[in-house]
């Protein structure tokens, strides 16, 4: 029972995000959050006198510097720029990193790590993880994962944990899955151009990705347990090449999102010209009452690229009760429940809605469109 309560508590903390989140993709890529994995009391893997936390930070700073120099319209937010931790409790530390990303209204989250094999010095290569659960993991891959900070992963062998996590994974994938996978594929493509061994993209129930409300990846830049790769990822040349590969991936990703917004953006409605007034009508034509342009607040439960029937079974117990509103961007169809005069009242309804839709959050609507409201 205590274990279940702990999982539920983390789940609620993970969802305690800024209410204005959720429009990350629809607004384009304006804020990129770079997370240098580990830090402070959490060194990560250690081989040959080198600590993973330092390698991660050096690459993160190089990547951020490239974006800041060459992409002036994109803001870079770092979870850390020095050797520090946010809590001596690892789970709280991971949550703090996600909180930084969410509070910054991040549009893309990149977590940088290095790998290690507990039993093999020959294993090498690069891989990128996205939020999910793979049923095809080999025992070797699982050994690598759980030897390196098991606490960073949800234990999906526990049925209580798995049920909660899978529900949230489904919603994350529905909203951001396409974009996370696109970024992961770009990263692996640019790694491969360097001649690195491509270990591919893997779906894993990572706590830090679970708690971020935006497209997110965690990339493993090489194996510290392999002497050749350790030398490479610790060298200035190796770190610059890795940072450049990530930077080129970011550029392509930003272009991809921009293109998707242009394709998916709703076209302005063409209204027919009003019919001329009859000649015999002398008094001024009566004007219809103006529709209220007052902003109201509601709880968004789902977003989609295409229209969904409000009676769709995916809405569960809210089937037939949800309403549709439009927004700019790729996922322009938003579905919500309830209408409230102020944000506080809408936020009070969120806990109830999250029993069915764990990713639910508050949005503001004006004139039939989702608007940004602080």
Where are these regions (language model features)?
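Sec-dependent signal peptide recognition
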Residues: 2-10
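Hydrophobic h-region of N-terminal signal peptides that target proteins for export
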Residues: 10-18
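Catalytic-core regions of hydrolytic enzymes
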Residues: 22-154, 177, 181, 240, ...
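Structural recognition of the beta-strand scaffold that forms the well-ordered cores
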Residues: 31-35, 75-80, 108-112, 127-130, ...
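Short, surface-exposed ligand-recognition loops at beta-strand->loop->(often short) alpha-helix junctions
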Residues: 56, 298-308
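Active-site-adjacent mobile loop/cap segments within catalytic or ligand-binding domains
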Residues: 166-261
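Short, highly charged C-terminal tails/helix-capping segments
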Residues: 259-280
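Extracytoplasmic
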Residues: 283-294, 305-374
């Amino acid at each position: 029972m205590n274990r279940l309560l702990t999982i539920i508590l983390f789940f609620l903390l993970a969802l305690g995000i800024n209410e204005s989140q959720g429009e990350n993709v629809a607004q384009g890529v304006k804020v990129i959050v770079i997370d240098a994995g580990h830090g402070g009391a959490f060194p990560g893997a250690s081989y040959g006198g080198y600590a993973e936390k330092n390698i991660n930070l050096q690459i993160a700073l190089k990547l951020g510097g490239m974006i800041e120099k060459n992409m002036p319209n994109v803001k870079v937010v770092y979870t850390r720029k020095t050797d520090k931790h946010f809590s001596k409790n690892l789970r709280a530390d991971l949550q703090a990193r996600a909180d930084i990303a969410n509070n910054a209204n991040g549009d893309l989250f990149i977590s940088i790590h290095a790998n290690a094999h507990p039993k093999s010095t020959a294993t090498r290569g690069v891989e990128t993880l996205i939020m999910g659960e793979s049923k095809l993991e080999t025992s070797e891959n699982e050994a690598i994962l759980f030897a390196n900070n098991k606490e960073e992963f949800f234990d999906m062998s526990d049925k209580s944990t798995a049920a909660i996590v899978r529900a949230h994974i489904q919603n994350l994938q529905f909203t951001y899955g396409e974009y996370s996978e696109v970024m992961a594929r770009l990263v692996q493509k640019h790694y491969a151009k360097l001649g690195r061994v491509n270990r591919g993209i893997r779906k894993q129930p990572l706590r830090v990705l679970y708690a971020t409300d935006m497209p997110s990846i965690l990339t493993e830049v090489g194996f510290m347990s392999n002497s050749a790769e350790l030398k490479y990822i610790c060298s200035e040349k190796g770190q610059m090449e890795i940072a450049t590969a990530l930077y080129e991936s970011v550029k392509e990703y930003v272009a991809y999102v921009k293109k998707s917004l242009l394709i998916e953006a709703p076209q302005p409605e063409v209204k027919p010209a009003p019919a001329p007034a009859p000649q015999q009508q002398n008094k001024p034509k009566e004007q219809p009452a103006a529709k209220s342009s007052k902003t109201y607040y509601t709880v968004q439960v789902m977003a989609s690229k295409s229209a969904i029937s409000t009676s769709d079974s995916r809405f569960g117990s809210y089937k037939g009760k949800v309403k549709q509103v439009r927004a700019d961007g790729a996922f322009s169809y938003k579905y919500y429940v309830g209408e409230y005069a102020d944000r506080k009242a809408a936020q009070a309804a969120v806990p109830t809605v999250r029993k069915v839709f764990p990713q639910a959050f508050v949005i503001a609507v004006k004139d039939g469109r989702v608007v940004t409201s602080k």
